[in-house]
Design a protein with these regions (language model features):
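Glycine-rich, proline-tolerant flexible connector loops at the mouths of alpha/beta enzymes
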Residues: 1-15, 168-170
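Expand to "…catalyze enediolate/carbanion chemistry for C-C bond making/breaking, isomerization
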Residues: 186, 190-192
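A short helix->loop->beta-strand "cap" motif at the edges of active sites that frequently abuts
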Residues: 24-26, 78
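Glycine/small-residue-rich loop that forms an oxyanion/phosphate-binding "nest" at active or ligand-binding sites
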Residues: 20, 27-56
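Well-ordered, non-membrane alpha-helical segments in soluble/globular domains
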Residues: 9-13, 43, 119-123
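Catalytic alpha/beta core domains of metabolic enzymes, predominantly
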Residues: 58-164, 169-184
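Histidine-centered divalent-metal-coordination microenvironment in nucleic-acid enzymes
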Residues: 1-2, 31, 152
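Acidic-and-aromatic substrate-binding clefts and catalytic sites of carbohydrate-active enzymes
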Residues: 5-8, 36-38, 65, 89
Length: 195
């Protein structure tokens, strides 16, 4: 696919099967981002044709067709991770009626947000106000990646880090690979001030 994201059944199946063979106990998630197909109808058509299913999918509650997508995934036995990038997304999730069917909340503040920590906290306040107690994973992209990861550690949320999120280490130097990013995240999580 030349490095492009896809929801096409064959490459998705091949990827999931390869990961399961290599790491059989690793839960596998796929994104369902609308930017991949640019059409909510096309996205549904492709996912309906999946022959090998991930354990769960990330569903962005800012996108059109979210309810239909959640219905399809749940009917196929695929879990939902609710992707929230704003307070409006948090409210959309709460209003959707899918909160109780989600596995986790994915807080991913939009790149370029002036105060990403405050934006993430605002999303969390909406969730807490509605009694949403699902596990949370919080991450950011680019220069927001490390501050949001550290904030997630402080709050006891799950984290993720990789080249999809940032190409640099906390000190701003280039990372050689994903393993170096993960090692840096582990050092932050184990820092004495975090104990």
């Amino acid at each position: 696919m030349g490095g492009r994201e896809t929801l096409d059944p064959d490459p998705c199946a091949a990827t999931i099967e390869a990961i399961r063979e290599s790491c059989p106990d690793l839960p596998i998630s796929l994104t369902t981002g609308l930017w991949i197909t640019r059409s909510s109808e096309r996205r549904l058509e492709l996912i309906e044709r999946w022959s090998v299913l991930p354990d769960f999918c990330s569903v962005n509650f800012s996108e059109d067709g979210t309810n239909e997508l959640c219905d399809l995934l749940l009917n196929r036995g695929v879990g939902i991770e609710a992707g929230l990038s704003s307070v409006a997304d948090a409210r959309a999730l709460i209003d959707s009626g899918y909160v109780g069917q989600c596995l986790r909340i994915l807080i991913e503040v939009e790149p370029g947000t002036k105060d990403p920590i405050r934006a993430a906290a605002a999303i969390c306040r909406v969730l807490e106000g509605a009694g949403v107690r699902l596990p949370r994973l919080q991450h950011g992209m680019g220069e927001q990646a490390w501050p949001l990861l550290e904030d997630a550690i402080v709050h006891g949320y799950d984290v993720r880090i990789g080249f999809e999120d940032t190409l640099t280490l906390p000190d701003g130097s280039p990372a050689n690979d994903n393993a170096e990013l993960v090692a840096a995240a582990l050092r932050l999580a184990k820092a004495p001030s975090r104990s």
